[in-house]
Design a protein with these regions (language model features):
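Hydrophobic face of amphipathic alpha-helices that form TPR/SEL1-like repeat modules
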Residues: 1-16, 22, 41
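Hydrophobic alpha-helical segments that mediate membrane insertion or helix-helix packing
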Residues: 17, 55, 153-154
Length: 250
């Protein structure tokens, strides 16, 4: 789907410096539309109120299709990130399907509880999907990080909006297409490629119920600010870098 304004940006193979393709450049208008669609899907109950057995079936199908398209997705990840194809095969073809399978298998094994009370009182602890969840994904593990955010939220019955890094949007878009093939209903899983303004719009949106962010410590702090200035949505933060390396002239 094109961005509302029709804008696009190029994604580059960092190993060659050559253009791969043009991708929709989303902005706050697209965020508003995606949140509206996600909320409508959530409120309809088409996914949020579907049976655990149905969600399990769809997520296991999702895992199966990710395995089926593992080689294709690994190549796509490699050319979009510049990573070794061997690394991409391990992450994309092996680990990503495993995560969807794990959460799919978990769905019908998590239950509510009856709290201890006196005989005249009944206390029930019920697990419910929080609503519309935004996942902000970095460039270093684009598909894996997207899956880590998608799978548990979808398993719980939430609607999910993924904002991939502008450097590496391709596999997140492809995974959303595979999700539709697996049976994820329209509006339940959305991907918004674009720049930092898209992440900020998601963080500030009052109809986004939770944010999961992976990225720098500085930008993670912004999301706490966005939450405090909007609807106090819960924000899960995975911040900071590790494993630096030194490149010498020779």
């Amino acid at each position: 789907v094109n961005a509302i304004d029709g804008n696009k940006f190029e994604t580059i193979n960092p190993a060659t410096g050559k253009k791969l393709c043009a991708v929709a450049k989303c902005n706050h208008k697209d965020v508003n539309l995606a949140v509206k669609v996600s909320r409508k899907a959530f409120n309809s109950g088409v996914w949020s109120k579907s049976s655990p057995e149905h969600r399990k079936e769809v997520l296991l199908k999702f895992a199966e299709l990710l395995r089926k398209h593992g080689d294709e997705n690994s190549v796509l990840e490699s050319v979009d990130t510049g990573k070794l194809i061997t690394d991409c095969i391990n992450e994309v073809a092996n680990d990503a399907p495993m995560h969807f399978q794990w959460y799919g298998e978990l769905i019908d094994k998590v239950f509510g509880k009856v709290g201890p009370t006196e005989p005249s009182i009944t206390s029930l602890i019920v697990k419910e999907p929080i609503g519309v969840v935004a996942g902000i994904v970095p460039w270093n593990f684009p598909l894996m990080m997207a899956v880590w955010k998608m799978a548990p939220a979808l398993a719980a019955g939430c609607s999910v909006i993924i904002k991939p890094a502008e450097d590496t949007p391709l596999t997140a878009i492809r995974v959303a297409q595979i999700g539709k093939e697996a049976g994820i209903p329209d509006g339940v899983l959305n991907v918004l490629p674009g720049y930092g303004d898209v992440g900020e719009a998601l963080g500030r949106h009052k109809d986004v119920d939770a944010v999961s962010f992976t990225g720098s410590t500085e930008v993670g702090g912004y999301f706490l600010k966005y939450s405090s200035e909007s609807n106090l949505k819960p924000v899960a933060l995975e911040m900071g870098g590790k494993s630096p390396f030194i490149v010498l002239e020779d």
